[in-house]
Amino acid sequence: MYIFFPKLNPIIFTIGPVSARWYGFMYVISFLFAMWYGKKCSIKNKKIWYEKKIETLLYSIFLGSCIGGRIGYIIFYNFSYYSQNMLSVFYIWEGGMSFHGGLIGAIIVMSYFSFKYKKKILEISDFITPLIPFGLGAGRIGNFINSELWGRVSPNFSYAMIFPNSQNQDLKEIKKYPELQLLLDQYGALPRHPTQLYEFFLEGILLFFIIYFFSKKDRPTGSISGLFLIFYGLFRIFIEFFREPDPQIGLLKNIITMGQILSLPMIIAGLIIMYKSYYKK
């Protein structure tokens, strides 16, 4: 017995030609949470520089991660399409964001603040890191409401979900596995892993508490950032085994996804940062 995707409207309300969507709303509440939690952390840790500059820092990182996320998606996932459809780069309502691109954008912004205010970049990233998982989780809820980024076909998994808008991809699966035709006829779509919810739990909830409890004690500079890179990379690589690869890319060499390739350097960088934080004098 499979689970049917609930009837969720991705649009909150519409006024004239303008529609407010849940996905965009998730970005808003993520930023508001980051602003609130960031100020709370700055007061608790008595980081005077952060108290004075936190709003500018967070606004800049939010903007940098959004721009980086868009550019990252274009370069990493669909460069051939956007190189021939340049105006589509600005059609952000059509979707297309990359966490890894957003991370690069955030790092560029933090590097600027590090240079301007004579702070170590890892001091800044250690402050920012606990604010990230909430946004990751909220974003995946937005993906779920949009019924996008669903997982791979899993007919033997009892809690697989039927996503009605996966039919185009399902037809490609039928060509490879004709035995799935009966399931398609019966349910209207093939059962898939609800990987948005997996990511919500691992990258949103679990990662938040890992970073939260780790950062409650005084830690060496860089260790919080390193821990985040390691666990996000591990969680993302794990989930990619269940997530449907982007159709325009598929499995690279029929083995690995682009998300896994981009996450592996995060783990390596996290391990190096952790080692230097604790052992390099």
Curated annotation (Swiss-Prot):
UniProt xrefs under Pfam families: LGT (PF01790)
Family: Belongs to the Lgt family.
GO CC annotation, single: plasma membrane
Function per UniProt: Catalyzes the transfer of the diacylglyceryl group from phosphatidylglycerol to the sulfhydryl group of the N-terminal cysteine of a prolipoprotein, the first step in the formation of mature lipoproteins.
Superkingdom of the source species: Bacteria
Topology relative to the membrane: Multi-pass membrane protein
Gene: lgt
Compartment list: Cell inner membrane
Alphabetized PANTHER family for the sequence: PHOSPHATIDYLGLYCEROL--PROLIPOPROTEIN DIACYLGLYCERYL TRANSFERASE, PROLIPOPROTEIN DIACYLGLYCERYL TRANSFERASE
Entry protein name: Phosphatidylglycerol--prolipoprotein diacylglyceryl transferase
GO BP terms, alphabetized: lipoprotein biosynthetic process
Molecular function GO labels: phosphatidylglycerol-prolipoprotein diacylglyceryl transferase activity
Residues where a 1,2-diacyl-sn-glycero-3-phospho-(1'-sn-glycerol) binds: 140
The keyword Transmembrane helix appears for this protein: yes
UniProt pathway annotation: Protein modification; lipoprotein biosynthesis (diacylglyceryl transfer)
Disulfide bonds: none
Top EC class, one word: transferase
Residues annotated as transmembrane: 11-31, 57-77, 89-109, 194-214, 222-242, 255-275
EC id: 2.5.1.145
Keywords: Cell inner membrane, Cell membrane, Membrane, Transferase, Transmembrane, Transmembrane helix
